[in-house]
Amino acid sequence: FAGDNLDDELYVRWLQYGVFNPIFRPHAQEGVPSEPVFRSDKAKRLAKSAIAMRYRMLPYNYNLMYQNHAFGKPLMRPLFFEEPNNTDILDYSKAYLWGNDILVSPVLEAEKRAQDIYFPKANVWFDFYTNEKIIGGQTKTVRLNENSIPTYVRAGAFIPLTKPISNTSEYDNSTLELHYYFDTSSPETVRTFYTDNGKDVNSIKNGDYEMMNFIAEYKGSNLKLNLKQIYVLRYTDENTLFPKDKAVDLRVHNIQNAPKSVKVDGKKVNVKWNSETKTLHIPIGWKASETKEIKIKLKR
């Protein structure tokens, strides 16, 4: 943003795009201030929402950095990674994958009300904000709203979020909001997430890190989820950032009816099912090195 470019809408769109970008910051030159505080009240409100979401994405984004470091996987991935034989999308630039499981389509024009997005085939996608289900292998015109840019999650994905925080030092890994996007098209899923104390550059070398393994299996009307800590860091005084116990707010999306029953480690538990969002909320206490098994009996 330079010269007389004071477009608040595009400023906000830039920050919304930055949520799913390796670098999150506003840019400006000459006499244009880059900070949100110098924008309109509406722009400040929308900017605050985007900044808050960036912090909430910390568990997912931190794992992307690990995958990049350990395996060379890019954080931002072109859609032809999904369909390498589809020459029509070799230069497709209207959307990209943020990691393996999130599809993002930036909004680049002001006053735009809709845009066409290609959804990779052989997948089902869910709107990150509304839970709308979209079948892959098609180009779909989606309506835009000012609160966010089009963002979608792959069916079968686990997306870990942290509680609302205002800076990275507040992230302590003691609470986790874990979203699982259920769909019969993806009956088996395995995802692994890396985390450490966020300070020591030698965490992997020193063995001071944690690998969380999330597994989903669906058969008949039975959905089983396992949460495993396949490697737990050494809990020393220096690693107080990582409590041994976690409070997990498990949210299972695309559950069309209230389930017949939900069991955690063989015991029936009370859960909340939202009839509007079709989301099941399951609170779980998770101790270090402990495997949690969640069995959900669905209504057909």
Located regions from the model:
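Preference for bulky hydrophobic residues occupying beta-strand positions
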Residues: 106, 117, 250-252, 282, ...
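Short, surface-exposed charged micro-motifs
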Residues: 94-95, 116, 213-215, 270-272
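Solvent-exposed beta-strand/loop surfaces of large extracellular or lumenal domains
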Residues: 127-146, 261-283
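Extracellular interaction modules
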Residues: 144-146, 286-294
